[in-house]
Structure formats: structure tokens, C-alpha cells
Amino acid sequence: MFAGLADSTLSRDDGYRFMVLGRAIERVDMTVRLLLSRVGDSGSSPAWVTLLRSAGAHDTYLRTYRGALDAGRVVEFMLLDRLFPRSIFYSLRLAEHSLDELLNRPHSRLGATAEAQRLLGRARSELEFLQPGALLESLDGRLAGLQKTCRDVGEALALQYFHSAPWVAWTDAGHGEGVVIEEGEV
């Protein structure tokens, strides 16, 4: 409900772009977690149907693959489909686009200038140019790498846009030992 209301009423300013960017990164992370939960399952396990339903992808998958349920195709669909909004590839591309708009450089002559932009582009291109048939090889490692990318992108965005101020905490050291000053960053 919130997503529909936000999409239909919010101005397309930086706040909206941050919301879309965050939602896309979170969608990548959650889809990776869904896939990681099924990596060890057999190809004919009914758990793959559950995975598709959990992602709201069951009907679209059935239309795309004409009803043939296969673990390899489910993984391919959830990772690489360019038209399904909850696939990892689609979400990475959406996150890249949102970040380009935030940087006010959608058609820059230079490549990635921000760390988050570089990380998103690398993750997307690794999926996009994956060798045919290599998708299921070391799937758990590839998914763990995507999860790490989501975490790294979040940290890069925090450093780039949300500057933290150093904090000072005064604590009583106890029984006549003086005052201790602790410093760090929020």
C-alpha cells in the first residue's frame, strides 16, 4: 500500500530517488536470501514453487516458461529476467538508474565516479555477461557476493550522502579515577 501511495503522490525529487534506490537494493538482498534458502534443494522440490510465490513471481514465471517448473529456470528467472521487477538484474539496473539521477549525471561522458555506482555496475555486468550454462556453478558463492555488494553499496552511500559527525561521550570513571572522554563517529 505504501509503495503504491508513494509512487502516485510523491514528487520526483531526491527523496523519491533515495526511496527507489533503497527499495531496489533491499529487493536484491531479499531475493538473494530467498535463493540462498533453496540452494541445496533438489531440482524437482516443491520448495521452488514456494520461492516463486514468496517473491510474487509464480504467475509471471509460469507465463514466461509455459508452466515448466525447473530449478535452473527458477534461478535464471529470479536472477536474470530483464522484465520482472523483482528479479535481481532488474533491481540492480533500477538502483543504478536511480543513483545516476541522484548524481544528476544520467548521460555522463565518464564512467562510474562514485563507489556505490561502481559496485552496482560491476554486479549488474557480472550477471549480464555470465557465460550461458554457468549460472548454477558456484551459485551460493555468487549469491553471497551479491549480498556483500548490497552491504558495501549501503556503506558507500552512507559515506557519500549521510556524513556523520564525531561524537564525544563523557563518562564517570567511577571512584575518584577521573573523567574519561570517549571519541568516535556516529
Give the positions of each predicted feature.
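Alpha-helical transmembrane segments and their helix-helix packing motifs
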Residues: M1-V186
